[in-house]
């Protein structure tokens, strides 16, 4: 990594009130960037916050802080795509993939039984597959995977190689999945967006890579889900610290 100061720039946007006061989540995003790219990063996050299909926010916060610790480098995950023409078929594919990742079927069903509750969390939930319960203790806040980015030139080369669209949604989702799967105690992630216009979701796992599923909900549905399945061996606080605080670059090549 070059000896240059990087900054974490994070945006969150909501409507009717800030998130912690019960406001409706509209959008969020972040970048890891050097000083020369700050203006472009802030402009991009501002545009993202005001162009989301969940509505126009009346609260937005953009936060900047310098990164004063080494930035870890993580390789992108292998990628695959599964066609599904109904949410039911998409969710069935997700269940099969979670089982292939090593999660017992009865624990998959136990997590699914609580999805309506988990969907209320603004971030992810940690689900222990030994105890069969949520363990993060964060309530509606959840766990927010943060302080990661995928340098644009590197992402563009990856997208070209894998015949993937060069859009920010895939870049951001894959970056989150790669960071999550890099933690040794997390077996898999199950995710679909709360964006009513975006119906594609994914299962990500060390064993499987990043497995996109075409349709996991109906258009117009504003409910989303993000569950991290843990193996029961983790120290919860250190896991959350890694997910929220450890700066990470996703990088397929040797040099940023």
Swiss-Prot record:
Reactions the enzyme catalyzes: heptanedioate + ATP + CoA = 6-carboxyhexanoyl-CoA + AMP + diphosphate
Swiss-Prot/TrEMBL cofactor(s): Mg(2+)
Domain of life of the organism encoding this protein: Bacteria
The keyword Acetylation is annotated on this UniProt entry: no
Signal peptide: none
Keywords: ATP-binding, Biotin biosynthesis, Ligase, Magnesium, Nucleotide-binding
Sample GO molecular function, one term: 6-carboxyhexanoate-CoA ligase activity
Enzyme nomenclature, EC number: 6.2.1.14
GO biological process: biotin biosynthetic process
Biochemical pathway: Metabolic intermediate metabolism; pimeloyl-CoA biosynthesis; pimeloyl-CoA from pimelate: step 1/1
Quaternary organization: Homodimer.
UniProt family annotation: Belongs to the BioW family.
Reported function: Catalyzes the transformation of pimelate into pimeloyl-CoA with concomitant hydrolysis of ATP to AMP.
Protein name, UniProt field: 6-carboxyhexanoate--CoA ligase
């Amino acid at each position: 990594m070059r000896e240059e100061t990087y900054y974490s720039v994070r945006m969150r946007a909501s409507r009717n009130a800030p998130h912690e006061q019960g406001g409706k989540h509209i959008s969020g995003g972040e970048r890891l960037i050097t000083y020369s790219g700050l203006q472009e990063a802030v402009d991009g996050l501002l545009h993202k916050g005001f162009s989301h299909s969940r509505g126009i926010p009346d609260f937005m916060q953009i936060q900047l802080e310098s990164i004063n610790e080494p930035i870890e480098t993580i390789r992108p995950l292998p990628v695959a795509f599964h066609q599904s023409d109904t949410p039911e078929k998409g969710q069935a594919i997700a269940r099969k993939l979670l089982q292939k990742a090593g999660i017992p079927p009865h624990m998959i069903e136990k997590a699914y039984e609580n999805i309506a509750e988990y969907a209320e969390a603004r971030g992810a939930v940690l689900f222990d597959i030994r105890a069969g319960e949520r363990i993060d203790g964060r309530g509606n806040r959840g766990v927010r995977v943060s302080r990661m980015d995928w340098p644009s030139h590197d992402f563009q080369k990856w997208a070209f190689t894998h015949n993937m669209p060069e859009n920010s949604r895939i870049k951001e989702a894959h970056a989150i999945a790669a960071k999550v799967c890099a933690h040794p105690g997390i077996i898999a992630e199950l995710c679909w967006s709360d964006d009513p216009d975006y119906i594609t979701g994914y299962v990500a796992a060390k064993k499987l890579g990043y497995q996109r599923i075409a349709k996991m909900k109906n258009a117009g549905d504003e409910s989303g889900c993000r569950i991290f399945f843990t193996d029961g061996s983790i120290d919860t606080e250190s896991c959350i610290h890694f997910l929220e605080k450890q700066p990470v670059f996703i990088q397929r090549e040797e040099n940023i």
